[in-house]
Amino acid sequence: MKKTPLFEIHKELGARLIEFHGWSMPVQYTSIIEEHKAVRNQCGLFDVSHMGEILVEGPGALESLQKIVTNNVARLKKGQVLYTPMCKDDGGIIDDLLVYCLGQDKYLMVVNASNIEKDFNWVRDNSNQRTEVVNESDNYALLALQGPNSKKILEKVSSVNLDSLKFYNFTTGTLKGAEVLISRTGYTGELGYELYLSPDKAVEVWQALMEAGSDLGLIPAGLGARDTLRLEKGYCLYGNDIDENTHPLEAGLGWTVKFDKASFIGKRALLKYKEEGLSRKLVGFKLKGRGIPRHGYPIKDNGDQIGVVTSGSMSPTLSEGIGMGYVRYDKATPGESITIVVRNRAITGEVVKLPFI
């Protein structure tokens, strides 16, 4: 099993470690609810070094990326970040990822841990000959500092001017002598920063951040809280809410598909879905009774199955069962009453507009 550069720190902190896509990762340190609330109200620090980084560069890099992803990479200037799906010919989602514009003809794709090898092969095989594609995943550690106090904490240990750093923009600077790419991005819906750095500097930077945040409510946070935080904001998780059998339009990601772009992989299939209409849609829902919806639970209407839960949890913020799932398109309107089958119990739920908070 792979270990991040912070593995020993997680053990020292008493984290509960689990196997996650071939990595030993901290799912929680104290409790998911405590870590979740810290991120919403103060700050949390996550080790997400299991994520993958793929460098795409050369005179053909932009042309290759425009063909490979659905969003418009051409609009990126140096220092900007783009969220985009990457689709197959049939519109199915290979992965959802971030594209960083490092400079002219130089981009970094940040991909899900479960898909690194698959994505690397796909990007390499579908790039033109004037593009070099390199799997740089082993050369990066990735820390996510998330929560309302994240800016104050980061300013204590870095000389970078964060006032001018806008959402989905990044800059570079030094932190405890380490060269760091500081990105104003995250998976929590809070003010936050993601820090890309050399693996051999990860421990030093983690400790510096924890020390700087000691009087600002900073605590380490695991993958459990990361999941409940993203769910409350209605963010998709690859492998749960989206995969190769779902497409961006039904997943509520239509805003990332730029049909006015020249041809890209999946464009024809997605255009057909757009013209013919959707048969199902990813929705958010709340339970009206006690229970926790989980991935794979049936969604019914008058006894007929109309969909399936893709993500679900007890919301630490709302203290009620929330989830996302695909339902038949005619049942996807907020306010619709549905039934979730939780451990053979039928619990009434209601379709709601995302995000939950």
Swiss-Prot record:
Transmembrane intervals? none
Q: Mind listing the GO biological process terms from this record? A: glycine decarboxylation via glycine cleavage system
Kindly list the GO CC terms recorded for this protein.
Answer: cytosol; glycine cleavage complex
Q: Does the keyword Transferase apply?
A: yes
Q: What InterPro entries does its record include?
A: GCS_T, GCS_T_bac, GCST_C, GCV_T_N, GcvT/YgfZ/DmdA, GcvT/YgfZ_C, TrmE/GcvT_dom1
Q: Which SUPFAM superfamilies match?
A: Aminomethyltransferase beta-barrel domain (SSF101790), Folate-binding domain (SSF103025)
Q: Name one GO molecular function term.
A: transaminase activity
Question: What Enzyme Commission number does this protein have?
Answer: 2.1.2.10
Question: What's its catalytic activity?
Answer: N(6)-[(R)-S(8)-aminomethyldihydrolipoyl]-L-lysyl-[protein] + (6S)-5,6,7,8-tetrahydrofolate = N(6)-[(R)-dihydrolipoyl]-L-lysyl-[protein] + (6R)-5,10-methylene-5,6,7,8-tetrahydrofolate + NH4(+)
The record's listing under Gene3D superfamilies reads: Aminomethyltransferase beta-barrel domains, Aminomethyltransferase fragment, Probable tRNA modification gtpase trme, domain 1
Keyword list, A-Z: Aminotransferase, Transferase
Q: Which domain of life is it from?
A: Bacteria
Q: How does it assemble?
A: The glycine cleavage system is composed of four proteins: P, T, L and H.
Role this protein plays: The glycine cleavage system catalyzes the degradation of glycine.
Q: What does the sequence similarity comment in the record state about its family?
A: Belongs to the GcvT family.
Indicate what this protein is called per its UniProt record: Aminomethyltransferase
